[in-house]
């Protein structure tokens, strides 16, 4: 019998059918090759939006800079960055008037954070531009390198461990006439292999000292490295994103702390909350507008889109905002917060790797690094690239482009949200002084605008007024990409609203499945994803049960761990069958050891080991949870781990899952090919860093680990901790006198070695 698919929807309210429109099967697109072209696009576009501004030259670096602020008034329809300082300041003043004390309180909260934050805050985050090596590194390594260079140049305030003191060093480093850095390089030589008698290339890694004069150092300190944004769906063209270096990071962190504190107090802000909390916040604003539009008023909502939000924002505006927000605060605090926008007004964009050329006839490939773009003959390039390079040439210095206007992606999300909300705030009747009024939601560059008025003309007038007010602060609402609807149906940050937010379960589909970390983590993540979707995304019990069965099937195929009594033959089936036969309590075997699945939708919150513990044979328990098992490279697992899950839309999300350490929590070994490259020195530094941190955590289990106060080093802290613990253990009879004496002796030896060093 044929089924007419429309019958499926007869009983379903229209808004619930959204999950059937899922377009994102398959992998998202990734970028290959260099991001140089995309970065040049960004730089050129940003300058084009501000082209009527005034040019000036930076006295320290010699970089040409364009300043569009307080220049010509913006025009209708054309996106531009011509923000007017007095308009921004006025918007801030009205925001404060409607929220008395908001800036004052946020400043006090931030001041406390500034005084307490440790420098290790900067180790969070992925890739960071490492100015000492002039390329990207993991954040922790980049920070370690920066501090190492600072100390060897006599900058030692950072030793207190406070972030604010590290920032003092950053400020001082910019006044120095020169900075000495250590760079890694590699030498290649051809040598004859003794065994095979063939010629092979041998690489050796060296470190060499290099001096940077003030100008070169400043350029590096102000550089944002650029990469291509990966895995963006629904776009034909890729685009560039930026990673700032360690000099900028700390200052940005404090500014964003202040802005976050303000956003938390603004009902129209979609940041910093997320998920259900965000939905509740937004639903409140909509409810307010709908209740207030009594029978006499019309209410319309614009699902908004802004043209090139980042490229039209201007750091000088952010400086004005901060100056206003902190106007009654102590001088030191105002200075710390104004440095980030000042650095951004003088930023340089690194053009990335450059271009790759290949000659088909001569089978040659050659890389043109970004540094050479300033004076290479343009006849080698195609039309579009030639135009880009010609346009960007006046801005180039040492392979970086001077980029004063614009913000680069994702740098001041919170602060730009404050700016957006300040315009939404102006929609109250006491400010519009007419019959129309507006309110809305803002989350970084995404917005929804709700306009109420007695008639259609009023709605139109309200939208126009909002559009033009935005223009005055450098926000360009796109008339082409925004659409208007009766209030009750709109989209905001991929949440779809139709008489309430609709659960769009299909957006979570890509995060179902086996993650590929290890058997233990994958099982845990898989069931947690299903559990979370039952809680947050209307995943019904029947569908969840089906998802669970599909997941278990997927898991068994991935790890080739079909049940011990199955007929399926795989590489592992011989071993698993043997285990199955010699196990008394078969229900106790983990799924990854060929056991049965005991999960159902009621017990997804229990880790599998705990679920089956009582059912396990004793010797199986002993093998499974044995930290001394020599075949396991064990990582110590906190009771909660974080996994990165990929929804179809938006950024990768971090999700917590329960982790029980068993012999299945193995870590794959690192690829060996890295050991022969110039990365090797860096890798060794990184491993040492890791080892020190792990050792430190052994001495200070997280329960008792308070942030160190004062200036004792890690070694001193560990030695004194060891002595205290040993004394307690000795006095309570947990260790013998000989052991106690030995520990004390080791501690003294360590101190002696430190003194000699």
Curated annotation (Swiss-Prot):
Gene Ontology MF terms in the entry: nucleotide binding; RNA binding; RNA-directed RNA polymerase activity
Domain RdRp catalytic: 286-483
Motif Nuclear localization signal: chain residues: 187-195, 203-216
Assembly notes: Influenza RNA polymerase is composed of three subunits: PB1, PB2 and PA. Interacts (via N-terminus) with PA (via C-terminus). Interacts (via C-terminus) with PB2 (via N-terminus); this interaction is essential for transcription initiation.
Family: Belongs to the influenza viruses polymerase PB1 family.
UniProt-listed Pfam families: Flu_PB1 (PF00602)
Entry PTM: Phosphorylated by host PRKCA.
Assigned GO CC terms: host cell cytoplasm; host cell nucleus
Official protein name in the record: RNA-directed RNA polymerase catalytic subunit
EC top class, as a word: transferase
Gene3D superfamilies assigned: 6.10.140.720
Keywords annotated in UniProt: Eukaryotic host gene expression shutoff by virus, Eukaryotic host transcription shutoff by virus, Host cytoplasm, Host gene expression shutoff by virus, Host nucleus, Host-virus interaction, Inhibition of host RNA polymerase II by virus, Nucleotide-binding, Nucleotidyltransferase, Phosphoprotein, RNA-directed RNA polymerase, Transferase, Viral RNA replication, Viral transcription
Catalysed reaction equations from the record: RNA(n) + a ribonucleoside 5'-triphosphate = RNA(n+1) + diphosphate
Protein EC: 2.7.7.48
Region called Disordered, residue ranges: 53-82
Any one GO biological process: viral transcription
Highest taxon above the source species: Viruses
Species of the source: Influenza A virus (strain A/Duck/Hokkaido/8/1980 H3N8)
